[in-house]
Structure formats: structure tokens, C-alpha cells
Amino acid sequence: MDAIKKKMQMLKLDKENAIDRAEQAEADKKQAEDRCKQLEEEQQALQKKLKGTEDEVEKYSESVKDAQEKLEQAEKKATDAEADVASLNRRIQLVEEELDRAQERLATALQKLEEAEKAADESERGMKVIENRAMKDEEKMELQEMQLKEAKHIAEDSDRKYEEVARKLVILEGELERSEERAEVAESKCGDLEEELKIVTNNLKSLEAQADKYSTKEDKYEEEIKLLEEKLKEAETRAEFAERSVAKLEKTIDDLEDEVYAQKMKYKAISEELDNALNDITSL
């Protein structure tokens, strides 16, 4: 009987232990189910987060791709700009060389102009001398004309006296001879005056020819000076255009450099964000 009681107690104890174990198992089951549900929720959240991260990574990848394309375009623009700058530098060098040559030609032209002005001054002084000589020759010619007129008057008087002597040949033979001598002297002097008049006329023609020659030279010098001034003005215009082109290209280069720097900073920021996102994914 005692054995049965002990066995009943043992069975009762085993039953209580079994009930406790069952309750514990039920609690463990519920805890496991709760944990499993929590894990499933965490898994779903992780899947959503992973999907969002993948979308974000894809978005960042597209942004990086766009940034790389923009960077390549900016680098290409920078390369083209450097080529343009090199070409512009060559053009500037050519313009400077052409400007130096123009300045040399201008200096030569100014020297020639100075020489021409000196020659013109000398020519002007020569013209004044020639004019003074011409005035003196005119005065001399007027004097010779007066002398010629006087000689003609003397000749006329001689003719009249000759006629008078002819009428009074017998009485005035001696006076007739003197009148004939005076007439011969007058005729000789008249011939000399005619020769001097021819010489004066030739001198005047020579002076007129020289004056025309100097006038032609002066017109030629004026044309050369005008041509040189036009060439100088053209060279100055090309130099101003080259300076404006240089300033414009320098501004373009500065803008491109700013754009390249901005693209690099943007690419750096995107790379940092992408690295952080990848680190977050790796840590998960």
C-alpha cells in the first residue's frame, strides 16, 4: 500500500513536472513563435530596406554615371579649351609679330616721312630761291624791255635823223656818219637784248618744269603717308580684336575650370554617399 502511495506520489510529481514542462514548453513555443514572427518582421523590414538600398544604389549609380559623363564632357571641353588657348596663343604670337613688323614699317615710314619733310623744306627753300631769282630775272627782263624800247626809240630817232641827213647830205655829211654809227650800235644792242630775252624765257620754262616736278614728288609723299597711316590703323584694329578675343577665351577657360571643379566636388560627394550606403549594407 505504501508502495502504491509512493508510486502515486511519484506519478503525481511526474504529472506536475510534466505539466510544468508542458507549460514551460508552451511558453517556450510561444516565445519561439513570437521570436519567429519578430524575425519574419525583421526579415521583411530588412528586405524592404535592402530593396530601398538597392534602388538607392541604382539611383546613385545613375547619378555617378551622369556625373562621369558630365565630367568627361567637362574634361573634353577643358581639352578643347586648352587647344583653343594654344591656338589663340599662336594667333596672338603671329599678331604680335605682325604688329612688330607694322611698327618697324611705321618707324621706317616715319623716318622716310621725316626725310621727305626735310627734302620738302629744302625744296621749299629752293623754290623760294628760284622764285627770288625769277623775280630778279623778271626785273632784269623788264629793264631789258625798257632798254629795248629806248633802243627802238633811238633807232627811230636815228632813222628820222638819217632821213634828215639824207635831205641835207651836202650840208650835214659829218653828222650823217655819226648818226649811222649810233644806229649800228643801237642795232647791236637790240640783238643782245633779244638774246638775253630768249635766255630769260628758257630759264622761266625750266623753273616751271622744276616746280611741276616738286609738286609731283609732294603728291607722291602724301599718298605714301596716307597708305602708311591706313596700314597702321588696320594693325591697331587687329591688335584690339586679338585682345578682346584673348579676354573672352580667358573668361571661357575660367568658367570651364569652375564647372570642372564643381563636377569633381559633386562626384566626390556622390562617391562618399555611395561608400556609406555600401558600408550600411555590409554591416547588415
UniProtKB/Swiss-Prot annotation:
Residues in coiled coil: 1-284
Phosphoserine: residues carrying this PTM: 61, 87, 158, 206, 215, 271, 283
Residue ranges with Basic and acidic residues bias: 12-40, 51-78
Main location: cytoplasm
Known function: Binds to actin filaments in muscle and non-muscle cells. Plays a central role, in association with the troponin complex, in the calcium dependent regulation of vertebrate striated muscle contraction. Smooth muscle contraction is regulated by interaction with caldesmon. In non-muscle cells is implicated in stabilizing cytoskeleton actin filaments. The non-muscle isoform may have a role in agonist-mediated receptor internalization.
Membership in a protein family: Belongs to the tropomyosin family.
Protein name: Tropomyosin beta chain
Origin species: Rattus norvegicus (Rat)
